[in-house]
Amino acid sequence: MIDMDEKLRILLCEDDENLGMLLREYLQAKGYSAELYPDGEAGFKAFLKNKYDLCVFDVMMPKKDGFTLAQEVRAANAEIPIIFLTAKTLKEDILEGFKIGADDYITKPFSMEELTFRIEAILRRVRGKKNKESNVYKIGKFTFDTQKQILAIGDKQTKLTTKESELLGLLCAHANEILQRDFALKTIWIDDNYFNARSMDVYITKLRKHLKDDDSIEIINIHGKGYKLITPEPES
């Protein structure tokens, strides 16, 4: 969990030395603590030794690419926000980043102001989550703790990523009602552009897999509108 009273500590991995130094200096000037590493291997070693609040990874790096690095980081910490920087603009590459669990994806060239905006947008979501009281939802045979981001059924507990938790929380708040697609996108992703919409589709697929142990639960598409979480009404 990010401590808002401490200086935000960013793990920055970028193999372009000039760009990396510019990014580090700019972020430090904005009040962040940014540590720069030239490849994914060095970045992961630093991640294991130190505590970071947010990661910014270039995709194409030597020794270990950004996608592989993100997967390893996610395995160790499902909550830490990750932003990808890349020159890749193919839809397949961008979707691959979101499948891994990226919180945002910025294509090069980009402005320093844009990166700062994306970081601040993520922080607003974290602050909002931190300020909310814990809600525990009963979803069929599942119990979902929004604060701990844990989905449980019987003795099985699944730790959800931040975006999985946020999206499932919205679906639970609108259980058996239509969750409007635009509302969900602007609430969680800030922007309802094409790539964010595809990212949300990926997370819906992940949530369906998490919920597959209870046949009474279903997330259905409502064409042109959004999604609906079908779940038995809780017993009174």
Curated annotation (Swiss-Prot):
Phosphorylated by RprX. Signal peptide: none annotated. Residues 134-231 bind DNA. The modification 4-aspartylphosphate is found at residue 58. It is found in: Cytoplasm. One of its GO terms (cellular component) is cytosol. It holds the Pfam family Response_reg. Keywords: Cytoplasm, DNA-binding, Phosphoprotein, Transcription, Transcription regulation, Two-component regulatory system. One of its GO terms (molecular function) is transcription cis-regulatory region binding. Gene3D superfamilies: 3.40.50.2300, 6.10.250.690, Winged helix-like DNA-binding domain superfamily/Winged helix DNA-binding domain. Member of the two-component regulatory system RprX/RprY. PANTHER family: PHOSPHATE REGULON TRANSCRIPTIONAL REGULATORY PROTEIN PHOB, REGULATOR OF RPOS. This is Transcriptional regulatory protein RprY.
